[in-house]
Amino acid sequence: MRSVLPFRALTVAFACILGLAMFPLGTGAQEVDMNRYITLTVKKGATIVLSLSGPENNTPVRIVSGETDFTTSVDTTVGVIQRRIDAKASTLTIYGRVQCFDCSKNGENITALDGSHNGLLTMLGCYENQLTSLNVRHNERLTVLNCSSNQLTSLDVSHNERLTALVCYENRLTSLDVSHNELLTMLACYENQLTSLNISHNELLTTLACYENQLTSLNVSHNTQLYGINCSKNRISSLDVSRNTMLEDLTCNSNRLTALDLRNNPELKSLDCAANQLSALNLRNNPHLNMLYCYANRLTSLDVSRNTMLEGLLGHSNRLTSLDVSHNRELKALDCANNRITALDLRNNPNLSILFCFNNLLTSLDVSRNTMLEGLACHNNQIVSLNLRHNQALAQLHCSNNRITSLDVSHNSELQTLDCFGNQLTALDVSKNSQLTVALCWGNRLSTDAWNRFFCSLPDRSYMPNEQIIYPLDNRSDSQKPQVLAANGNIAKRKGWEVSYYNDGQDTPITGFTGSYQCTKIYK
């Protein structure tokens, strides 16, 4: 459901670009250029996997590591052929006119890379290793660098002025100077230890991922070409995106924002501003908004009437007393749980498949128009009745801790989880729920006879490899215990059901059933 920023996929695209090694049998008439070479610090005895390409077909290269010493040739063709090399020493050197070089995913077998003696390099991939140092100071032709998922504490790209894509996430960088990389269009430096990031000289940036650092501020006013920003999980207290009019995807969750002005972002499609300190959010100028994550803020109201393309709204854990989604006919997922909402009108949301509205003040809930509903969590409200006749796709139902006196699930043949504890039910029939695997139903008002009929209505699971489970009681003092123990719980056990006390994952099987009730044919 959640949108994926372009820079999330760029690492995969980069790997495809760099999977271009071709190793023909012949070396041609050319000689290896021994003045150009790349040196790796490797684990002696390890097998190193490389991919290479040259500026022309049949470019000769020589690979040396102790006793390993051979010459081969590479092409310009982008391919998927890789070369496996046995490291016979602690260094591995690749001589020749190598233009694209990829030594990624060798893990602890590569700890350092020096490409400074090969000025022809245009693309370098060395991600998912254990690099502690990387020297690209003399690689002035470099346009793409992916050194992510290593152990780098510093990275000097000041001499790589042609760089257009820099991917250096998941390292230990405390600083990053990209002031000399004015051609940069994509920067992914997330999951480092950066305390500041100056991108004022990178006016061509289109995607920026700097999340999970220690940034206290971020100035994107010079980056008017940006369409994707992810600066989440930092310490940013203010964010000005008024000049980023092309912005489509903004993820700034888990910061310290108290305000967010989106009036100049008409192209915005996905917004994640969750887990901040926002008390207001104006979305009237964002007609293309498709996904909204604004949960865990301090919102007292939320107007989404202009966001008619909205498919996902996650606004739980705020201070909302009402929520109007009558203009959001495309809505598929709504999470407004943990608020103070007293009423919820869902008649104009025919595409709704997920609804979380638990922990509110609802006294009623009409889902009769939501025929595509698959998951419903409305527990911890004050609902007195729940009509599920029209929700035939419903698979997950959580309606516990309400005031429901009867519950008809006979039309919900896809139901897998039934969570209805803490209500006022006097009967429960699941004979039509052939997919049911979990039932939490303690704390109701079922008599012993009603428990017997419930056990009889359970679908037969004796043929399944894993036991299904029902919870007629919880581990605390339960007033229903005498009625449950007087029933014949062995009926459920013979059908392959585990009958347990609910105890937050440390369930204890219920023993001591004294009933001898036998099911009638209607339940067989």
Locate the predicted segments by residue:
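N-terminal capping/linker segments that flank leucine-rich repeat
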Residues: R2-T11, I17-L120, T224, R243, ...
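Right-handed parallel beta-helix
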Residues: F101-L131, H138-E140, S148-S149, H159
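Leucine-rich repeat
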Residues: N118-L120, N139-L142, N160-L163, N181-L184, ...
